[in-house]
Amino acid sequence: VIREKELSGIGSVDPRRMSTLIDEIIAHVHPNDFICIEGFPFATQRAMFAGGLHHGIRNELFKRKIQYYEVAPNALKKFVNVTGWVGETGNKRRLKDKEKKKAVMDAVKELYGYQHKSDNVVDAYILAQIAKDLWTIKSGVFSTLNEGYGRKNQFEVLDTVKG
C-alpha cells in the first residue's frame, strides 16, 4: 500500500519547523516497517537544515530500535537510471538542480507510471520501490528479482544498499 503525503512541519522558522517535521515523519513509522532513507545530501544549498533533519530522523529511529537502510542520493537517481548527465560521449554536460529533479520525475513516470508535483514525494516513492525490492530479496520471496531478472542499474543499487 502506497500513501503519498508531503510533510513540511509547522511554520517556516527553525528549530520549530525541523522538530515538527521530524515528529510528522516518525508518526508514520511503525515498528516492523522496512525503511530506506536517503543519505546526506552534501551538495545542497540548505546543508544545515538537511543535516539537522537527517540526524533527527536517524536519532528517532535509533531510539525506537528501528533498523533502516541508507540510500545515497546518487544511488536513488541511479535506481531510475538517471546519471545526472546529458549529451553524447565527448559532449556531455552535468544536469543542474531543477533539470536533475525533472529528469528523475520523468524517469519515475516512465518506469512506474507514477507522478507527483513534488520532487520530495517522487524521491520518497523511489525509496519505497528500493525498500520493496530489498525486502523481497532479503525475505527470499519468489520473485523475478530473486531469479536475477531486472535492470542492471537497480541490482547495483540494491547490492550497495543491502551491504
Language-model features, listed with the residues they occupy:
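Phosphate- and other anionic-substrate recognition elements at nucleic-acid/protein interfaces
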Residues: 1-163
